[in-house]
Structure formats: C-alpha cells, structure tokens
Amino acid sequence: MSAYCGKYKDELIKNAAYIGTPGKGILAADESTGTIGKRLSSINVENVEENRRALRELLFCCPGALQYISGVILFEETLYQKTKDGKPFVDVLKEGGVLPGIKVDKGTIEVVGTDKETTTQGHDDLGKRCAKYYEAGARFAKWRAVLKIGPNEPSQLAIDLNAQGLARYAIICQENGLVPIVEPEILVDGPHDIDRCAYVTETVLAACYKALNEHHVLLEGTLLKPNMVTPGSDSKKVTPEVIAEYTVRTLQRTVPAAVPAVLFLSGGQSEEEATRNLNAMNKLSTKKPWSLSFSFGRALQASTLKAWAGKVENLEKARAAFLARCKANSEATLGTYKGDAAADTESLHVKDYKY
C-alpha cells in the first residue's frame, strides 16, 4: 500500500508522535456553543461569548497545567479568540509547548432506513477549511463518528459509512498539513455487557483501519481516539483492571503498530473512573506498541467548572482543581497514578451525547 507521502509527511509524523508523548495528553475544549452552554448553565453562568472565552482562558492560562498537555482541541470560535490582555489563545498554547487542534466535523445526521443510527457530515468544504485552520496555527484535527450498541446495532451500513467518512476526512487533513484524530465513538448507552462492547469495538476499529488503508492514509501521521471497552451505562460495573484487559486486547487485535498513540475519550465516565481506567491500562505488562493517553473534555473540566462557578474570586481554586486533574492524568499515562488527586466521582454520562 502506498501511504500519503506529500509535502507534509515528515511534519505529520513528528506532530503525531509529539502529541503521543508519554506523560502528556489532549485537553478536548472543542464543545460547540450549545454544549458549552449546558455546562455554563449547570453553574448558573450565561452562555455568551465573553463567558465562554473566560472559561477557556481559565484552562489555557492555568500555571503549570500545560506541561501535562501536548494538544488542545479547539472549536472554531476559540481558534481566533484572545486572552483578556489581547494575546491569541493559539500563541498561549504554542508558547506552552502545546499543539493547537481543531474540530472539523459538522455534526451527525440520521442514516435513512436505520433505527436512528447516524453518520457525520462536513466533507464538502473540508480541504478549504483545513488549509485555513493550518494557516491560523492548527496542527491537528478531530472528527467524531458516533455508533450505538442495540439489539441490531451498529448495522453494517452504519459501520461502513462511518469508517469511510473517517478515512476521507483523514486523507484530506493530511493533504493540508493536519494530523487527523480518528474518533469512532461507540456510545456507552444501554444494558450490554463488556463482552458485547469488546466485540462491537473490534468490529468497528477493524473497519476503520481497512478504510484508512484503502484511502492511503499515512498511519504514522494519525492518532486514534476510541472509547474504552466498558459495560453499558445500565449494566453492572467492573473493575479498572478488567476494563484495561479488555480494552488493550481490543487494540492489540485491531490497531496497527504504525499508529503512534491512542488517546481515549472519557465517554461520560466520572473524572476518577476515567483516570483509574487509563492508569490500569498503562500498568498492564503486555504488548503495547502505541502510547496510551487521554483526550478528555468533561473528565478534565468537571471539578474545575464547579470550583469556578463563573466567579473571579474562585479563579485560584478552579485552577488548582484543573492542575490536579492534568497531573493525575499525566501520571495515569505512565501507570503511576495513586488516586490521591481531588476528583469528581459523579458520573458525567449524558444519554446520546452530542458535542
């Protein structure tokens, strides 16, 4: 197979490897205006641009936090926002050794003839947008495909459509200098057990890598953002060690060694659960040719939001909470987390979650 070997090849490989640096991970701060509005309303803060900007400044300018972060996924609005002192967020991140990334999908639409299964849209002007984002300083991108587990789901049609969609997105990104994060999220919603989740995740990942190869995507210049293999939200919980064994086995069976890093989504787990599960994976002594890290949104921000509550006087307390989560997850990428960081243990699960 001839993989992409255009002018950005070396840069893509270097940036993908950097994002996967052990001890670091991704902060997902790419919530849409509607989604961040729900977060802000949970702390009684109005969803206006200044409040959204203030929250992002709280996170990006938190002293000491960026040493644990290799990339931040931004929403388009944030790519062009500045600190209150007028410094572009992109410059703040770069100076902190963090690569800016950008969410490029345009949400999901229902696949006709299925039971509410979806595919992701946004390919039409993707090349043009990627070139513009690269110019603005972005160096990687994210595209979320969403699948669900049901009696007959995911259907082969939904799997194929989403795998092909991710592959088309990935090669367009690479042609424009952006490392594509491939995110086939299998929602945790439902009563299924962990074996069913493992089977579906293997099937979906196998389809994704087949499609990526068919589109001549340079795997060394990509990253994978999958769900952890867990029981459904309405099923009996299992230990982090069991989740680690199932998840790593699933990756071993499906993800090529050429991929530099796997950065898990938290999928509505509590802050503490997400960190403990990641830590358990990195403690496993088995074949792991990729680094295993995090690309967390809610699981990095929940306790920070609660501490901040939109008040200037709470800034220090909120930053301390954010720094603690960044450090805890950094330790989890090394398998050294001891569970001593203040964390929110409340489930962050939202049924049929939309970004």
From Swiss-Prot:
InterPro entries: Aldolase_I_AS, Aldolase_TIM, FBA_I
Domain of life of the organism encoding this protein: Eukaryota
Places the protein is found: Cytoplasm
Disulfide bridges in this chain: none
Enzyme class: lyase
Molecular function (Gene Ontology), one example: fructose-bisphosphate aldolase activity
Known EC number: 4.1.2.13
Active site per database record: E183 (proton acceptor), K225 (schiff-base intermediate with dihydroxyacetone-p)
GO cellular component term, pick one: cytosol
Keywords annotated in UniProt: Cytoplasm, Glycolysis, Lyase, Schiff base
Residues annotated for substrate binding in this entry: R52, K142
Biological-process GO terms, alphabetical: fructose 1,6-bisphosphate metabolic process; glycolytic process; response to anoxia; sucrose biosynthetic process
Record pathway: Carbohydrate degradation; glycolysis; D-glyceraldehyde 3-phosphate and glycerone phosphate from D-glucose: step 4/4
Site features described as Necessary for preference for fructose 1,6-bisphosphate over fructose 1-phosphate, chain residue numbers: Y355
Catalytic activity: beta-D-fructose 1,6-bisphosphate = D-glyceraldehyde 3-phosphate + dihydroxyacetone phosphate
Pfam families in the cross-refs: Glycolytic
UniProt record similarity statement: Belongs to the class I fructose-bisphosphate aldolase family.
Protein name: Fructose-bisphosphate aldolase, cytoplasmic isozyme
Biological source species: Zea mays (Maize)
Source taxonomy: Eukaryota, Viridiplantae, Streptophyta, Embryophyta, Tracheophyta
